[in-house]
Amino acid sequence: MRKPIIAGNWKMNLTLKDAVAFAEEVKGTVPASSKVDAAVCAPSVFLAHLTEATAGTDLKIGAQNMYDQESGAFTGEISPVMLKELGVTYVVLGHSERREYFGETDAFINSKTKKAFEHGLVPIVCVGETLEEREGGKFESVIREQTTNSLKGLTVDQVKNLVVAYEPVWAIGTGKSATEQDAQDSCKFVRDVIAAEFGTEAAEAVRIQYGGSVKPDNIKEYMAQPDIDGALVGGASLETGSFLKLLEAI
């Protein structure tokens, strides 16, 4: 039985004061980690404050990105060593916004994923198609390529322990959301691709999130699907009330 995982992706939002207040309010209220993994993936400048505020609780902290080197002349970048030292648990890699706005490739995401594992971080690897790709009948080829290339060279054990977030780009921050059946079919396809590459055991163990305008009023329908193990949530994770409602729905 795969444990559900709900991760908030705050993107470039909130202030430090708001972020710490969120953590202080939520950390004692989240369900036990034996039932569901709960995390918020925050801007890097908040991470030290948040890991300190949530230490010893069931609310885990994630980063939204990292570089694929431990150190060096990479101005503005953050290394996995730095994240691990701060007590970060998860790191989102390959989000569609990183792919679109910063030109991140599957190969770069793959390199980051391997480096995250080297340093004891849990990667949340994002894959997803645009509306144009879906309507053009390219969904399967795009998702197969992204999934295969982003996970290339990982061990079976690593695949079992990572998280894949399927995020249809056309449903992110648009208010549109895939139907629960569409989301299920898409997440099952991701699992099938992983099975073909890494075997059934890995595919049955890996947790797959759906991300795309998930809210408290629709999360139950998504979570009822057999191949959806959680959600990567944007806007609905910015307020304590809605974030806790997401967790209560599990």
Swiss-Prot record:
Enzyme class (EC, first level): isomerase
Pfam families from the UniProt entry: TIM (PF00121)
Keyword Cytoplasm: yes
Keywords associated with the record: Cytoplasm, Gluconeogenesis, Glycolysis, Isomerase
GO molecular function, one term: triose-phosphate isomerase activity
Location, primary (coarse class): cytoplasm
Pathway assigned in UniProt: Carbohydrate biosynthesis; gluconeogenesis; Carbohydrate degradation; glycolysis; D-glyceraldehyde 3-phosphate from glycerone phosphate: step 1/1
General function of this protein: Involved in the gluconeogenesis. Catalyzes stereospecifically the conversion of dihydroxyacetone phosphate (DHAP) to D-glyceraldehyde-3-phosphate (G3P).
UniProt-recorded name of the protein: Triosephosphate isomerase
